[in-house]
């Protein structure tokens, strides 16, 4: 069973989950925009929400737009805090080097994921406890997986 939370919303077009079990609800463009190659634009969605305390929403790219058209979101994920009451806007970037991309009113341009969040209490210390990974960062897990499931 999936938990639900009631979220007050002002929108001409409600975000919609495309399939049962989807994590993200589609956000649609409220304004037509043509993105030239390499151009970015902040697109209004016409959606404003009132998240309850203890929740945040995250605006993430749609995989089909990235794969088929080279469209991505510049600050993905975009964070919508519980106290924000303004319109959700999506800064979209056309990464294609030669083709412009037209966004029409009503086009699905991003997804909105609503999640409970935990607020951290940061505790200053002089040293951190050891871990298996330690300070190994970018690329430290390798690029291929062996038959046994180990990273090479």
From Swiss-Prot:
Enzyme Commission code: 3.6.1.23
Catalytically driven reaction(s): dUTP + H2O = dUMP + diphosphate + H(+)
Pathway terms, separated by semicolons: Pyrimidine metabolism; dUMP biosynthesis; dUMP from dCTP (dUTP route): step 2/2
CDD domains given in the database record: trimeric_dUTPase
TM region(s), chain numbering: none
Keywords: Hydrolase, Magnesium, Metal-binding, Nucleotide metabolism
Name the UniProt record assigns to this protein: Deoxyuridine 5'-triphosphate nucleotidohydrolase
Gene3D superfamilies: 2.70.40.10
MF-aspect GO terms: dUTP diphosphatase activity; magnesium ion binding
A Pfam family reported for this protein in Swiss-Prot or TrEMBL: dUTPase
Coiled coil: none
Gene label: dut
Family assignment from sequence similarity: Belongs to the dUTPase family.
Cofactor: Mg(2+)
């Amino acid at each position: 069973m999936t938990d639900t939370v009631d979220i007050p919303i002002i929108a001409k077009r409600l975000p919609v989950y495309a399939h049962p079990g989807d994590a993200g609800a589609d956000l649609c463009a409220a304004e037509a925009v043509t993105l030239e190659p390499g151009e970015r634009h902040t697109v209004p969605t016409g959606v404003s929400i009132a998240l309850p305390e203890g929740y945040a929403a995250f605006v993430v790219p749609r995989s089909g737009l990235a794969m088929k058209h080279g469209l991505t979101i510049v600050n993905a994920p975009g964070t919508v805090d519980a106290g924000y009451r303004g319109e959700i806007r999506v800064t979209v970037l056309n990464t294609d080097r030669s083709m412009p991309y037209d966004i029409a009113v009503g086009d699905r341009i991003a997804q909105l994921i609503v999640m409970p969040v935990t607020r951290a209490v940061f505790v200053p210390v002089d040293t951190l406890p050891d871990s298996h990974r330690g300070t190994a960062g970018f690329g430290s897990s390798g690029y291929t997986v062996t038959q046994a499931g180990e990273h090479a």
